[in-house]
Amino acid sequence: MSALGSPVRAYDFLLKFLLVGDSDVGKGEILASLQDGAAESPYGHPAGIDYKTTTILLDGRRVKLQLWDTSGQGRFCTIFRSYSRGAQGVILVYDIANRWSFDGIDRWIKEIDEHAPGVPKILVGNRLHLAFKRQVPTEQAQAYAERLGVTFFEVSPLCNFNITESFTELARIVLLRHGMDRLWRPSKVLSLQDLCCRAVVSCTPVHLVDKLPLPIALRSHLKSFSMANGLNARMMHGGSYSLTTSSTHKRSSLRKVKLVRPPQSPPKNCTRNSCKIS
């Protein structure tokens, strides 16, 4: 509770996502793999609708997700139309071991474009743990997602693989669309090798990397890392660049200035033989 007696919110943003797809693609399995959050809607919902909430961390901010799943059966199309209102993101789900579910994504996209046009979407291939029964090649699904202009994931609720990552990416897309680009920059967990490279190049100019007592392959990686991340930008181009620019400017200025010297008259008592230039 805050000082004024009002409850403190446990999240910074609240988003509503819809999981759409055929009835047997495992959308309920995805929701069941989420341990935290309520499994019942506070507003109540009819049969054929599954609901769950979960909270994710996105660049240090707490984002609460309301996840709604229609059964995917034809008789619930009316329910889908009503629950699609106000949705801020859509998760298109198919079963990688069921070709029919993948071919049905086009039908769901038409429904979404009709009742929730412009809502950000991602494509999710579910049940990756059944890869030995795969009927939808990863390359084909990836090409299909690129044609739609959406992000693609393959997930496994059984292994808890890519579930949170897919939700997090969709939340990032939604918040970026709503003008949160200043706060929601893509985050990256650096590997131990990247951390070591960052520590080295932060105190070593790139032109001195070749002189480090390291294997050639490692020196080459350090140089590439330095140029890619711009950590040596100041040492590479800072003082030397400004000095070169300044001196070049001065030389060009001198060339433009015409020196005018006052006329000099020879001394009165100076002759050709007696006058010497010191």
Swiss-Prot record:
Keyword DNA-binding recorded: no
Molecular functions (GO terms): GTP binding; GTPase activity
Binding site for Mg(2+): 69
Reactions performed catalytically: GTP + H2O = GDP + phosphate + H(+)
Gene Ontology cellular component terms for the protein in this record: endosome; nuclear envelope; perinuclear region of cytoplasm; plasma membrane; synaptic vesicle
UniProt region (Disordered), positions on chain: 242-278
SUPFAM superfamilies: P-loop containing nucleoside triphosphate hydrolases, SOCS box-like
Domain SOCS box residues, every copy: 175-228
Lipid-modified residues, S-geranylgeranyl cysteine kind: 275
Protein's pathway: Protein modification; protein ubiquitination
InterPro entries given in the database record: P-loop_NTPase (IPR027417), Small_GTP-bd (IPR005225), Small_GTPase (IPR001806), Small_GTPase_Rab (IPR050305), SOCS_box (IPR001496), SOCS_box-like_dom_sf (IPR036036)
UniProt cross-references to SMART domains, sorted A to Z: RAB, RAN, RAS, RHO, SOCS, SOCS_box
Subcellular location field: Cell membrane; Cytoplasm, Cytosol; Cell projection, Lamellipodium membrane; Cell projection, Ruffle
Residue span of region Switch-II: 72-88
Domain notes: The SOCS box contains two defined motifs including the BC box that recruits and binds Elongin BC complex, and the Cul box which interacts with the Cullin family of proteins to form a ECS (Elongin-Cullin-SOCS-box protein) E3 ubiquitin ligase complex.
Similarity-based family: Belongs to the small GTPase superfamily. Rab family.
Name this polypeptide is given: Ras-related protein Rab-40B
Organism: Homo sapiens (Human)
